[in-house]
């Protein structure tokens, strides 16, 4: 985004029923939250800014969205849409999670083109991955690759203008 209105008006849809909860260090803590009727319920399109400041413990811990959505094994697991420009990004992955990070701590970091500094929530990152911190919280973490083993994952990003 990095545009004039941060990322608040971007519409997000995610095919997930739960998120991985985070602790005070924003690490997945091994618990999961059913997202129905919470600020994390993006099963239908919602503007990112619509509920980002709601009084919810997980939003407070992360300063916004910085959570792994446990996506369903389906196509088009995540769609990000900018109604103003018509730009749409659709994401599908074979990995179990998509991390949605709303740039909650961008201030004081790098500058954008033209030298203007980024501010909090000036962008959104959408990252296909295994569950963060899974090496410490899963009985049989899939993030370990041993000598001789092979690893394959596929993530596709499709961009369109409507």
Task: For every predicted segment, state its role.
Residues 1-162:
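An exposed, glycine/acidic-rich loop-and-rim segment of catalytic or binding clefts
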């Amino acid at each position: 985004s990095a545009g004039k209105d941060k990322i608040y008006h971007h519409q997000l849809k995610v095919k997930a029923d739960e998120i991985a909860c985070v602790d005070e260090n924003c690490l997945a803590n091994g618990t999961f939250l059913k997202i129905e009727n919470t600020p994390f319920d993006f099963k239908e399109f919602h503007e990112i800014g619509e509920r980002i400041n709601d009084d919810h413990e997980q939003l407070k811990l992360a300063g916004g969205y910085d959570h792994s959505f446990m996506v369903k094994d389906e196509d088009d697991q995540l769609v990000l849409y900018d109604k103003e420009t018509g730009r749409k990004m659709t994401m599908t992955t074979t990995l179990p999670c998509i991390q949605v990070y709303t740039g909650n701590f961008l201030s004081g970091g790098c500058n954008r083109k033209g030298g203007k500094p980024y501010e909090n929530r000036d962008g959104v990152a959408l990252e296909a991955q295994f569950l963060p911190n899974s090496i410490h919280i899963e009985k049989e973490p899939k993030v370990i690759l041993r000598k001789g083993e092979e690893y394959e994952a596929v993530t596709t990003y499709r961009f369109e203008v409507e």
